[in-house]
Amino acid sequence: MEIDYRIYRIKLNHSFGISRSKNDWYDIVIVYLIYDDIVGVGEVAPSTRYNESIEEVVSLLKNGIKLPEGIFDYQKTWEYIYPQLNGIKALEMGINMALWDWRGKKEGKPLYQLLGIKNPNMPITSYTIAIGDLNTIGTKVEEAKPYSVLKVKLGTPKLDKEIIKEVRRFTDKVIRVDANEGWDLDYALEMCKWLAEYNVEFIEQPFPANKLNQTFKLRQYSPLDIYADENSIISDDIAIIRDAFDGINIKLMKCGSIEEAIDMIKVARMYDMKIMLGCMVETSLGITAASHLADLVDCADLDGNLLINNDPFIGVKVVDGKLKLPGGSGLGVELNNKYSELKL
């Protein structure tokens, strides 16, 4: 068994602005797990919000991850590799994704079947409109024409209302708002009431993760549901935040493994919380992996691959606004032949 990797720069259709940052590109790492003439593939999309860096990921991979000897066993291999990954959740997810892909290819089954899902009922995915020049909103809304739900990034108090008004000039589609920790309590109380008049479905992560008491207070007065993102990393977080939020946003790159994502779903259901499946800006590789879990959640925000113009993989599609999984075993993802630099 061996592990290989490639660094790849994904380029965005538009500058991607949120409350705390703005980017035109992101570097990711594609990892390959090779054994018995089968290649499992995974994606690592590190986030500086969680103190992750591409340099640390590459350093670990370059210096070598020790692999178990003998016949491949999924559980033993994962338990052997996991402690070596320095708690970098995105790297954990990339390796875990490659292991699941390898296992599915070996057994001739798609990932969702390995997880016990027989006939997945795929949800609608939202399409993200990031913070940017107000003059570009019309273009972005037009690009989002196939999607019935928009996720609009807010978190800049001087612009927030103008952004929503501008979106509403072009469409009456349902809006989900993501403030990315950009508000304070007084402003959020005002915005929740104001947004309720603009066909907004819910608000995601209004405050910094360390302001849980503010979220608890807001929830008592908000006419809109409140979802956790930065407060909802792993399953252990859910019991802590359940009285402050109505729902959670699960992202594979945050939680570190398919198993942990499923644990989060189970715990959220136990507390009667709503569940959204989200993503970072990723290629179709990572988005397809997440889509195999989409049957288990209430709504999806799996559009990271739609926001880039050099996606090197072919995987999940969107048909009439709904996610549609590819055929094939494992993740079912194929390399686009235009991007031969990612071939082994």
Residue ranges and their predicted role:
Residues M1-L12, I28-I30, D36, M280-L344:
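Flexible C-terminal active-site loop/helix
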Residues N210-D303:
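Catalytic alpha/beta core domains of metabolic enzymes, predominantly
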Residues V31, D37, I95, G108, ...:
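Conserved, mostly hydrophobic/aromatic
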Residues Q113-S222:
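Metal-dependent enolase-superfamily TIM-barrel catalytic cores that perform enediolate-based chemistry
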Residues V58, K62, N96-D101, K165, ...:
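Predominant activation on well-ordered alpha-helical scaffold segments within soluble catalytic domains
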